[in-house]
């Protein structure tokens, strides 16, 4: 076996540069010198011609190129253009006289609203307040509150709304009223309803089978639409 020893290169830098020149591909062949310290740029590696920055790019479509050209034209025409607006005329001053406001409208709202038989809002100087100051409760028979007495003294057999609601609440419920009304009993089981008519005492006594009372409902009603499991 024969071994050959090559002499070591005297200058390592020259040896590496020679190897790079031997193995350099054809696409990278250009006119730049390897002795420069800065690496080559893309413009050195590729042959590109720079066009005017304002000209449209050849890769754009026709519509984009037209829009770009119109925008450049509009910017060129707008340079040095000033908008001349007419001066704004001052608002004319109208001589307004103070509105005639009655003294009743200037009163506090807590003293102002009172209602008469026509349900109209009046001022503090209404006929009701004049009547209230001169009213003698010992003269005449009145029922209800002071407002009801005011209506009754004017010849109206009426009472105010508050006394009317109070009278309705105190009125006893008639037990015989609504005997023939239909009553619907709702059982605890969903979907089952039993209808029965409330009859008089004579018909209950004459019936052969007595009316049994419904069992007391201890289970709450299920108002959902989902059927309950059996």
UniProtKB/Swiss-Prot annotation:
Zinc finger (unnamed): 145-163
Subcellular location(s) per record: Host nucleus
Region (Disordered): 189-230
Chain span(s) of sequence motif Nuclear localization signal: 226-230
Interaction with RB1 in competition with E2F1 as annotated region, ranges: 40-48
GO (cellular component) term, any one: host cell nucleus
Entry's Gene Ontology BP terms: regulation of DNA-templated transcription; symbiont-mediated perturbation of host cell cycle G1/S transition checkpoint; symbiont-mediated suppression of host innate immune response; symbiont-mediated suppression of host JAK-STAT cascade via inhibition of STAT1 activity; symbiont-mediated suppression of host type I interferon-mediated signaling pathway
UniProt motif LXCXE motif, interaction with host RB1: location: 106-110
Domain of life: Viruses
InterPro entries: Aden_E1A
Main localization, broad class: host cell
Keywords: Activator, Early protein, G1/S host cell cycle checkpoint dysregulation by virus, Host nucleus, Host-virus interaction, Inhibition of host innate immune response by virus, Inhibition of host interferon signaling pathway by virus, Inhibition of host STAT1 by virus, Interferon antiviral system evasion, Metal-binding, Modulation of host cell cycle by virus, Transcription, Transcription regulation, Viral immunoevasion, Zinc, Zinc-finger
Motif PXDLS motif, CTBP-binding mapped to chain: 220-224
GO molecular-function terms, A-Z: zinc ion binding
Disulfide bridges in this chain: none
Coiled coil: none
Chain's role: Plays a role in viral genome replication by driving entry of quiescent cells into the cell cycle. Stimulation of progression from G1 to S phase allows the virus to efficiently use the cellular DNA replicating machinery to achieve viral genome replication. E1A protein has both transforming and trans-activating activities. Induces the disassembly of the E2F1 transcription factor from RB1 by direct competition for the same binding site on RB1, with subsequent transcriptional activation of E2F1-regulated S-phase genes and of the E2 region of the adenoviral genome.
Assembly mode: Interacts with host UBE2I; this interaction interferes with polySUMOylation. Interacts with host RB1; this interaction induces the aberrant dissociation of RB1-E2F1 complex thereby disrupting the activity of RB1 and activating E2F1-regulated genes. Interacts with host ATF7; the interaction enhances ATF7-mediated viral transactivation activity which requires the zinc binding domains of both proteins.
Protein family according to the UniProt entry: Belongs to the adenoviridae E1A protein family.
This protein's name: Early E1A protein
Organism: Canine adenovirus serotype 1 (strain CLL) (CAdV-1)
